[in-house]
């Protein structure tokens, strides 16, 4: 099953997440099909905290991809801000 979820990057104690489309059987930070955005939970000042390609996310959801709870909340925030 294809899912849209967060893949962790960044350094120790400084997380940075890529929003990726992947097979649910793959490891959290493993192989993915497409990168559709990023989330920086510790962004400050002028740094961009969230960027999502909503068109591509809607495309994948239309094809039957499931969305993780956290990514669903991020999509909701992005739509509210836009």
Swiss-Prot record:
Keyword Ribonucleoprotein: yes
GO terms, biological process: translation
An annotated Gene Ontology molecular function: structural constituent of ribosome
Keywords from the UniProt entry: Ribonucleoprotein, Ribosomal protein
Coiled coil: none
Family listed: Belongs to the bacterial ribosomal protein bS16 family.
Protein name in UniProt: Small ribosomal subunit protein bS16
């Amino acid at each position: 099953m294809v899912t849209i979820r967060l893949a962790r990057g960044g350094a120790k104690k400084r997380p940075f997440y890529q929003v990726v489309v992947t097979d649910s059987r793959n490891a959290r930070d493993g192989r993915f099909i497409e990168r559709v955005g990023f989330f920086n939970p510790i962004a400050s000042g002028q740094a961009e905290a969230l960027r999502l390609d909503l068109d591509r996310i809607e495309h994948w959801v239309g094809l039957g991809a499931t969305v993780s709870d956290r990514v669903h909340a991020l999509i909701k925030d992005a739509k509210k801000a836009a």
